Structure formats: structure tokens, C-alpha cells
Design a protein with these regions (language model features):
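AAA+ P-loop NTPase catalytic core and its hallmark functional loops
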Residues: 1-216
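Alpha-helical lid/collar subdomain of P-loop NTPases
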Residues: 201-342
Length: 342
């Protein structure tokens, strides 16, 4: 259902791993960042997922020069006593209406980093860290007469629990880098160019999955595999890998990273993947990513060698981890190559 877009008569070729990572990310965070070169399907993936599960989807084209939330959701004209809303605000309201209130709803921020997300998306970043019941935005300072009934006290709006934000990102001279706080809170994926095609069943009819059933499945997975993930976290905490990270790179992880692991890894397992692939992805995107443990000027080749050795040793000694940490090793070996050329 993800692969075949009947409306557009278009076939989308995503790998099983890409789908597994995307779904597990939904359990982990309400904010996704999809990276990759043009043409890899960054915008199409969330649209296809929403279509496949019978959910809602709104595409927001981020514009250069956005500075604050008013650019994203609209602004109140005090003289006219009128709120000029943008499509994002309409989507937040629509997601709460009866048709979509119990369906997954995805708001795609296309070219999210063509402006600085930490400016125009700042209030959303803060709100998404709160308990679902506390996630809301203030639209105006005082309540207005005849305000839409789903507004809070006639002057604010809830960020519904069934809403996910998916930002697509390019990295070139026209865009900005994301701040650490954005990367730390988001689920990050880099979509590769899809070289392989496969047979697609175009006869599958539409289905609808409720938001509540999706959340229930996520919760059941988290409970089922909680002890397994907790054991992996403890082994990492006691490993030479963490000691090298801390002593030579001044990098560690906190409660948020561990919470993300407790949500992400179980869903990956239930989607048919394994702990090694899941942990490899999380370490590569959260701990070893460019600018954190790699891409730095205060480390040298010896530091990278020590980190590779510690990582491989941890992987070999941990019986629940299969294969090799391919994403992590690719990052570290690329970094080692850069160091050798300077």
C-alpha cells in the first residue's frame, strides 16, 4: 500500500529497512527529519504512509526568511480583530475534527531547513517535549468572540497527540544546519537512492488504522521488550565504548536517548528487524553523527581508531547484537579517512 500510489499512478520503491525505521521512529518522537539527495523520496514517504493507513497529511512548503511561529501558523491582526491563519494551523485544527481525531495525521515541513527551524519551530520543539495534554500553542493574548469551538479558551490551540511533524532536509549552500537540540529530539533518517525495484501488488484495497490502535501497538511492543532494551543500555553504560566516548570525545548520553531507545528498538523488533540494526541506527544518528563525535577539529585519527576498536569490541561481546554496526563504522571510517588527509 505504501509502494503503489493509485491516484498518481506511481510506484515508490522503499526498502523494508526504510519502512521499519520510519514506523519505529513514529513510536519514538513526534518529529522526524528525513535527509537525502534530491529524488530519494523524502517527501513521498510520509505521504505514502499516511495514505496506506488511512490517515491525514498536509504538505507545508517552508519559505526562506521565516523567523517565528507566525510565519508557520499565521498571525492575529489586533486592528482588524482577525486571525490570518496559515495551512499549518488549519492542519492542527483539522487533525482534531471527528474525521481525523482517531487517525494518524502527518504534517510535512518540506525543505524544513531552508529557514532556521530553531526560530520558526521553536515553540513546537518545546511543546512536543511536554506531556500530550500540555502540548498547546498560544495564538493571541486574549480570547475572541465567535472563536472556533476547538480552540483553547478562544485563544490557543492544542497540538493533537495524533499529529507527527516530518521535515525534509537538504544540505547545501541554501540551507541551515540543524541545532543539536533539534537533532536530539527528532528521529533522523537518511534515505538512500533506491536502485532495486520489486513486484508491487496493485490490487490491495484501502484500509484505515486508528491512531489509538497504533499507539496501543507501540505500547505493547515497548512493554514486551523492555527488559531486553534495558539490558542493552546497561551493557553500553558499562562498556569501554562509552568510556572512550566520554574521555576522548566528551560525548555521553542522557535520559532522552535512553527513553528513545526504549521506544524505538521494541518497534523495530516487532517490525521484523533486530536489535543490532536498531541500535546501530540510533548510535549513528544520535551519538556519532557529524558535529557530535565526528566532524570535529579537536580529535585525531588515534581517537577515531580507539573508538572503532571499542565499538567493535562491544558489539562482539554483546550476545544479543547480530552482525556489525555498519552505519556507525561507515561514519567512523569516513572520519578516519578525512583525518588522514589533513
Amino acid at each position: 500500500r505504501i509502494a503503489w500510489d493509485e491516484k498518481e499512478s506511481k510506484t515508490l520503491y522503499y526498502s523494508l529497512k526504510d519502512i521499519q525505521l520510519f514506523i519505529a521512529g513514529l513510536s519514538m518522537s513526534r518529529l522526524h527529519i528525513l535527509q537525502g539527495i534530491s529524488g530519494t523520496g523524502k517527501t513521498s514517504l510520509p505521504i505514502a504512509f499516511a495514505r496506506a493507513v488511512g490517515g491525514g497529511c498536509e504538505i507545508i512548503s517552508v519559505q526562506a526568511g521565516w523567523r517565528d511561529k507566525g510565519d508557520l501558523i499565521g498571525h492575529f491582526n489586533a486592528f482588524e480583530k482577525k486571525f490570518y491563519e496559515q495551512a499549518t494551523l488549519q492542519a492542527l485544527y483539522k487533525a482534531q475534527c471527528p474525521t481525523y481525531a482517531d487517525r494518524p495525521y502527518i504534517i510535512v515541513l518540506d525543505e524544513m531547513n531552508i529557514s532556521r527551524p530553531e526560530q520558526y519551530f521553536a515553540e513546537f520543539l518545546s511543546a512536543l517535549e511536554l506531556d500530550p495534554i500540555k502540548r498547546k500553542l498560544t495564538l493571541m493574548t486574549s480570547s475572541q468572540n465567535n472563536a472556533p469551538e476547538l480552540l483553547i479558551d478562544g485563544k490557543g490551540i492544542k497540538i493533537p497527540e495524533n499529529v507527527w511533524f516530518v521535515g525534509t532536509a537538504n544540505h547545501d549552500e541554501t540551507t541551515y544546519e540543524f541545532a543539536d537540540k533539534t537533532y536530539d529530539r527528532a528521529h533522523l533518517m537518511t534515505l538512500p537512492r533506491h536502485k532495486h525495484t520489486f513486484e508491487v501488488d496493485k490490487t490491495l484495497g484501502p484500509v484505515t488504522f486508528s491512531f489509538s490502535s497504533l499507539e496501543e501497538a507501540f505500547e505493547e511492543a515497548s512493554k514486551k521488550h523492555a527488559d531486553t532494551v534495558a539490558s542493552i543500555i546497561q551493557e553500553m553504560d558499562d562498556s569501554d565504548f562509552l568510556e572512550v566516548l566520554d574521555n576522548e570525545f566528551n560525548v555521553n548520553w542522557g535520559n532522552r536517548f535512553e527513553r528513545h531507545l526504549m521506544r524505538f528498538i521494541p518497534v523495530m523488533l516487532e517490525c521484523g528487524s533486530n536489535i543490532g540494526i536498531a541500535l546501530d541506527h540510533m548510535l549513528a544518528t544520535k551519538v556519532l553523527r557529524e558535529g557530535k563525535a565526528t566532524g570535529r577539529y579537536d580529535t585525531d585519527g588515534e581517537n577515531i581508531d580507539n573508538l572503532i576498536e571499542a565499538l567493535e569490541s562491544f558489539w562482539e561481546n554483546c550476545t544479543s547484537l547480530k552482525g556489525k554496526p555498519e552505519a556507525c563504522l561507515k561514519l567512523l571510517n569516513q572520519e578516519l579517512k578525512k583525518k588522514s588527509q589533513t
